[in-house]
Amino acid sequence: MKNMIKSMLSFFVFLKFKNIWNIKDYLVKNNLDKGIVATVYDYYIHKEGGYVGITSKFANHPYMPHGFMGVFISDMSEIGKNAVIFQQVTIGADRLLDSNNQGNPKIGDNVYIGAGAKIIGNVKIGNNCRIGANAVVVNDVADNAVVAGKPG
């Protein structure tokens, strides 16, 4: 019964807002983290197997060819215009107390992030960058750069 109610609520919320990004924009604009719309947002994101923090910031809606499948974007992360984000990507905060890299990623415009890539901590990814599949990024990346592999 509970799932049926959530499904009905989701249907009506999506009728009003048209897509998940409009729901997120509404929640942020109105400083809401509770209520029916927030519940539907959380339900949809988790149902798709991902997480997009409500306080994460997007210059426009990113293109996700495989949907939210395994995508994790932490709260307070920032993503520029025309981002392409593939499945199983982590854009995550570093909150370890003894870390030199505490903070949230800031990603520039026109950035392509390949499947399984991990961007962790207080790093800045420049504009027009390509982050390869399964790359691990823990340092800043200059504009127009290509990153592949894992730090040594």
List where the protein language model places each region.
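Left-handed beta-helix
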Residues: 54, 59-60, 65-66, 74-75, ...
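Terminal amphipathic alpha-helical/low-complexity segments used for targeting or macromolecular assembly
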Residues: 1-50, 152
